[in-house]
Amino acid sequence: MTDLAARDRIIVPLDVPDVEAAITLIDRLPEAQFFKVGLELFVATGSTVLTILKERQKKIFLDLKLHDIPNTMAGACRSAARYGVDLLTIHATAGKPALEAAQAGAIAGAAAAGVQPPTLLAVTVLTSLSQQQLTEELHVPEAVPNYVQHLARQAEACGIGGCVCSPQELVVLKTACSDDFVRVTPGVRPTWAAAGDQQRVMTPQQAIAAGATYLVVGRPITAADDPAAAFQRVCEELTP
């Protein structure tokens, strides 16, 4: 995927409360190709927003971060795959049986609907978590990069197609996982934007150089007075 155009690498999150707000943002970003639908919008609208995106021929990152027992994971991924989404998140810490069940469910659901199966992405360590929180609150003694590497390797061994990780962990994943393993990176902020509430951030250009396949860029675009101009500005940062 190294030949992807800049605009195809940028995923814009629809972090809005309802369909009307989602449509407004989508239509203000005609050049954006990939949109993320997270928990807030999906719980509020169900599949309606997915249908709207498909009608506009946009790609969909369904970011539900599923985490449950294997049978439930299989069923949820089977149902999600029927919508024809491109990326779907599951928690890497759900364990190997759940990861394998999720992959099987996604393949079965897509086949039943006659669509391509989504690439499942294992969520490793949330970018809002610091090393101190991981150690003190979650009692995980591993350093963040080592823990991410372990979770990503395990996910790929279970047939999962990619992972979500912060930019700083991209370097260790270059050797830990195959070249085909998709790396989706939030915690990306252009040089002209503030870091916000994410602890481990990097510029778009730095993240791509470190091995990211896709970048999730939210508030620098969506909160801008002119989202289309901000989107173009991020694209220009990625264009040599």
From Swiss-Prot:
- Pathway participation: Pyrimidine metabolism; UMP biosynthesis via de novo pathway; UMP from orotate: step 2/2
Reactions it catalyzes: orotidine 5'-phosphate + H(+) = UMP + CO2
Report residues binding substrate: 15, 36, 63-72, 127, 189, 198, 218-219
UniProt keywords (A-Z) are:
Decarboxylase, Lyase, Pyrimidine biosynthesis
**Single biological process term from Gene Ontology:** 'de novo' pyrimidine nucleobase biosynthetic process
Give any Gene Ontology cellular component. Answer: cytosol
Q: Which GO terms describe its molecular function?
A: orotidine-5'-phosphate decarboxylase activity
Q: What is its EC number?
A: 4.1.1.23
Which InterPro entries does the entry link to? Aldolase_TIM, OMPdecase, OMPdecase_AS, OMPdecase_bac, OMPdeCOase_dom, RibuloseP-bd_barrel
**Residues in the active site?**
K65 (proton donor)
In terms of superkingdom, the source organism counts as Bacteria
* UniProt function note: Catalyzes the decarboxylation of orotidine 5'-monophosphate (OMP) to uridine 5'-monophosphate (UMP).
**Can you state the subunit structure given in the record?**
Homodimer.
Family named by the database record: Belongs to the OMP decarboxylase family. Type 1 subfamily.
Q: What is this protein called?
A: Orotidine 5'-phosphate decarboxylase
